[in-house]
Swiss-Prot record:
Interacts with incompletely assembled mitochondrial NADH:ubiquinone oxidoreductase complex (complex I). GO terms for cellular component: mitochondrion; SCF ubiquitin ligase complex. Belongs to the ATP synthase subunit s family. Transmembrane segments: none annotated. Keywords: Mitochondrion, Phosphoprotein. Required for the assembly of the mitochondrial NADH:ubiquinone oxidoreductase complex (complex I). Involved in the assembly of the distal region of complex I. Residues 242-301 are annotated as: Disordered. GO terms for biological process: mitochondrial respiratory chain complex I assembly; SCF-dependent proteasomal ubiquitin-dependent protein catabolic process. This is Distal membrane-arm assembly complex protein 2. Residues 289-301 have a biased composition (Gly residues). The modification Phosphoserine is found at residue 254. InterPro entries: LRR_dom_sf (IPR032675). It comes from Bos taurus (Bovine). It is found in: Mitochondrion.
Amino acid sequence: MAAPRASLRLVAPVWNRGTSGIRGLSKAVDPEGSQKKGRTLLQFLTDHFYDVEAVREYLLRKQVLKVQKKNRSFTYIKERYGPYVAGAYFVLKQGGAVKFRDREWMRANEQGLSSLEFRKLQEVPVEAVDASGCAINYQGLDNLLALKELQSLSLRRCPHVDDWCLGRLYQLADSLQELSLAGCPRISERGLACLHHLQNLRRLDISDLPAVSNPGLTQILVEEMLPHCEVLGADWAQGLKVGPEEQSRDAASSPIPAWPSAPPHQARSLPGCAERPTAHPSGSVGLTQLGGSGWGEGRRA
């Protein structure tokens, strides 16, 4: 009998481990345990949802403060070296480029600009600024509006330039000749209406403005507002409704033949079919859809 007892002592740990595994498996498939686990997950999400919102607000606030820091005024540089150097330093620090009179385009390198270069350009006015893609906002325009001899300004794809910023460009009306606003997501037709002060403009780029509701009509009105300016942007017919005469003319000139209609005797043989009149879309365009003031009289037919 000793041999069977010894064998039982050897087999007992293995059997206990197996039964514990079965008990653990029964706990895993227990419906009450799964419900408790679901409640725990929901409680976890509920407890940390406010924390996620707090982190999101913190990151957004941090981004706003970063943009404000980039658009601060360099008062010390302006007082010591003048407005030309201060404006150029502001643009170069954001990754843009500037062009002083009778000089080549200047961009900041990894080491930046030395004070000796600023002293040499202290009395040289800035004629052109390329701030494409820079984080310039309403506050940061203070550094550019002091450049009274500025002739060319590029604000392409600036994410923070909006209609309020365009309302301040009248301060450059005496010198500004070229302006690029292409790709600015916050500029609408209301902001473009503020450009009527810039009568010395010779070239204006308003292409790819997603906030403009009717690009074709907007370009027509801008051309009437600035008659001596070359306006670049969307096609004049983009967003306009085509009248019945234009539709019939386009159908006649189309290389694709129209679908052949049924003969009259076949149409009459169908019982209960009445002839339906063809509805033509209206060709009128409401100028009040732009919603902006300052455009003046629109184009009349």
